[in-house]
């Protein structure tokens, strides 16, 4: 339904964040998470802990996710969805020397890909449904290698 983007502009020496993404810029962590998502993720975790299957729990929260997107996206929170981007919901960060850009597919972002992948592997091994140590709206589905797609790039400028 929506897309996110995190962009580095070499000309402006800035990072632009639209949607749920994360970065480490000059050794400082930044994120742009969806304002409604944590509450819905907590509901999913509670449903699973109370005995509902992960698939059923995901289906149970899907109407809330869709409603939150249609009510809030590009009105309170910036996303890419084919309508004009809600510019007050974007984030611009100046860069002086180093940049790590990543999607929200990494529960914990680290300065290196190796460390970010290791943290993801630990999360998947210890809490594959993302209901305890990293609360999320979805967990690992059989046949997938992770709970979400992911992208990572590290630059020195």
Language-model regions, residue ranges each:
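"…together with the soluble PPM/PP2C metallo-phosphatase catalytic core" -> "…together
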Residues: 1-17, 23-28, 35-97, 151-152
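Generic preference for flexible, low-structure residues
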Residues: 31, 46, 115-117
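Short beta-strand segments in beta-sandwich/barrel cores
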Residues: 21-23, 106-107
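C-terminal catalytic subdomain
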Residues: 61-157
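Short loop segments at secondary-structure junctions
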Residues: 28-29, 157
């Amino acid at each position: 339904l929506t897309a996110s983007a995190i962009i580095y502009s070499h000309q402006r020496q800035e990072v632009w964040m639209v949607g749920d993404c994360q970065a480490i810029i000059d050794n400082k962590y930044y994120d742009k998470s969806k304002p409604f998502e944590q509450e819905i993720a907590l509901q999913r975790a509670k449903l699973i802990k109370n005995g509902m299957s992960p698939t059923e729990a995901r289906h149970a929260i899907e109407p809330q996710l869709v409603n939150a997107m249609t009510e809030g996206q590009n009105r309170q929170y910036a996303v890419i969805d084919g309508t004009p981007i809600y510019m007050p919901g974007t984030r611009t960060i100046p860069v002086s020397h180093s940049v790590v850009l990543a999607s929200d597919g990494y529960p914990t972002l680290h300065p290196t890909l190796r460390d970010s992948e290791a943290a993801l592997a630990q999360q998947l091994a210890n809490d594959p449904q993302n209901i305890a140590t990293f609360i999320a709206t979805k967990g690992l589905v059989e046949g997938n290698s992770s709970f979400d797609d992911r992208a990572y790039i590290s630059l020195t400028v």
